A protein has these predicted regions:
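M16 family metallopeptidases and their MPP-like homologs
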Residues: 1-24, 42-50, 58, 121-123, ...
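A short acidic-Thr-Gly-centered motif at the start of a beta-strand
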Residues: 288
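Long, His/Glu/Asp-enriched segments that create or flank divalent metal/ion-associated functional microenvironments
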Residues: 379, 387-388
Length: 526
């Protein structure tokens, strides 16, 4: 499986096997490879295809022999791989942990307050058999609220560029991959509506490199050269200059109408792209990634605790910088349409006539573990009902389902979504079916058989998710984030909650969706 790359071992053991195989390969064994494999043979078999119009396209058997003979005639010279050099040394004045607070949730984690004001949430994980042994998220409480209000759309474009290119010491992100010092370190930066984050994970033995990378990205950032930015701008402007896709244009209008022309959701236009320059790239980076007074670092690792503490003091507690920017009080985007709203558009077909239907229910629901579990029941049962009616009985689509979108932020509404494609002539009938099925669920609730089937599926899926989380520090760290920031409860007695879900709970959630706002999007090509 080493040669074919179909591992029969867990990743760590596979890596050990590969290293042992590679360590046994020397230049002396490689030097004789061509002769051993291709020349010391009584017969050479070749299968090739020569097109009629180009009969010499593939070499003949004699030509192949001549090529191999020329290789044997010349002594092979060793050409070892060479790597670029990276100055990875940093001079820092370490800080310290000034306060520790223990929390019993998630099996136990700690909150550390550092001497520079940064908060760290650290969780010591059980050993995992995976490549990632350190997962970190460096989260700044900035996001879109930190951008200049008069250049917001341009700033969002600049942020997208920053997130792709951000590196350090004259190297963009892509170039950093060439350095052996950073092998085994994964880097991701992102700027979202509510926060900006640097996400770093590392293999065993690369934990200090990960922390050092975080320090360099935040203290010695490199955003690339102007030529790279201008090429990206030119490529995007070229795409804007092409004939707009009718479906994309409709989606932009739909978003604008549903969310009340929220400034964070404006599409990139030529004016916004043209307004981006190197100065704005730098300003957007500083607004997103230098507010150290509001930096929170989440760490989950199965490595030595003392080492993690030392790296935190050296590379996190030493972060310094002023933050002169003000943040806006812009509210998060929420659907502003009330009641039942129908948004439609019809255009000429690109191929076959089709209607794309997205039926969205919007309702305020309290985000608790129990409510999320109730939504799992509703998703499973409604999906089965929609599939049975719209696909099996009506023959109206290949796939249809219902899914509840639960936001991390509990101040945002829940959304229940049914989306599918159908033939234009069936649109009105099937849109009516979507509402009728929800009305029936809100009136009578699910049957005992439906509850039993849903419960079995949900219990099985939960077990699969727990097994995956137990082997993934990235997933465990994500749970730490959601526990601390949004109050999610992953310690609840899942089986007890599952047994406590009744048909009336599912019916009541359906009633909330039915009583909420309905936004129906229909895009037709015929």
């Amino acid at each position: 499986h080493f040669l074919r790359n179909h591992p029969l071992l867990d990743p760590v053991e596979l890596q050990d096997v590969q290293n042992k195989v590679l360590s046994g390969i020397s230049w002396e064994s490689v030097r004789d490879y061509p002769a051993d494999m291709f020349l010391d043979s009584e017969a050479i078999y070749s299968t090739c295809y020569n097109p009629v119009e180009n009969p010499g396209f593939a070499p003949s058997a004699d030509a192949v022999r001549a090529i191999l003979a020329s290789v044997e005639a010349e002594p092979l010279e060793a050409q070892y791989l060479s790597y670029p050099k990276l100055d990875f040394d940093v001079a820092v004045t370490p800080g310290r942990i000034v306060k520790r607070t223990a929390n019993k949730r998630l099996g136990g984690y700690e909150e550390w307050l550092l001497s520079n004001g940064v908060k760290v949430y650290y969780r010591q994980a059980a050993p995992v058999k995976a490549n990632v042994h350190l997962a970190t998220i460096w989260r700044f409480d900035t996001g879109y609220r930190s951008y200049p209000a008069d250049k917001l759309t341009a700033a969002r474009f600049a942020a997208a560029y920053d997130n792709r290119t951000l590196g350090f010491r004259g190297c963009e992100r892509q170039a950093l991959r060439a350095f052996p010092e950073l092998s085994g370190v994964n880097i991701l930066t992102r700027t979202q509506q509510q926060a900006a984050s640097v996400e770093l994970s590392a293999a065993r033995g690369k934990e200090e490199a990960a922390f050092k990378t975080g320090w360099l990205l935040l203290q010695e950032p490199y955003l690339g050269e102007e030529a790279g930015l201008e090429k990206t701008k030119a490529d995007n402007l070229k795409n804007l200059g092409r004939k707009p896709n009718p479906r994309t244009a409709f989606e932009d209008k739909y978003t604008k109408q549903v969310y009340g022309d929220h400034p964070w959701l404006h599409p990139f236009d030529s004016a916004a792209i043209e307004a981006v320059d190197m100065a704005l790239l730098r300003e957007v980076y500083e607004r997103a990634f230098t507010d150290f007074a509001h930096l929170t670092v989440f760490i989950t690792s199965d490595l030595d605790r003392a080492d993690i503490e030392a790296y935190v003091c050296q590379y996190v507690a030493s972060l310094q910088g002023e933050y002169p920017y003000q943040k806006t009080a812009t509210a998060l985007p929420k659907p502003v349409l009330k009641g039942r709203q129908l948004i439609t558009e019809t255009n000429a077909p690109e191929s076959e006539p089709v209607s794309n239907i997205d039926y969205m229910y919007v309702a305020d629901v309290k985000t608790t573990t129990r409510c999320i579990l109730v939504s799992d029941f509703l998703d499973y049962i409604l999906s089965a009902r929609y599939l049975n009616l719209i696909r099996e009985e009506r023959g109206g689509t290949y796939h249809v389902g219902f899914s509840t979108e639960v936001p991390d932020n509990p101040t945002l509404p829940w959304r229940g979504v049914v989306d599918f494609q159908t033939r234009p002539e069936m649109t009105q009938l099937l849109v009516g079916d979507v509402r009728d099925v929800m009305e029936a669920m809100a009136k009578d609730g699910p049957t005992a058989e439906e509850m039993d089937q849903a419960g079995k599926y949900i219990r099985k899926r939960h077990g699969e998710l727990e097994r995956r989380a137990a082997s993934s520090l990235l997933e465990q760290n994500d749970r730490l984030v959601r526990t601390v920031l949004w109050g999610r409860d992953f310690d609840a007695d899942y089986d007890a909650l599952l047994r406590g879900i009744k048909a009336r709970d599912v019916r009541d959630l359906a009633r909330k969706f039915l009583a909420g706002d309905h936004i129906v999007e229909i895009y037709t090509e015929e």
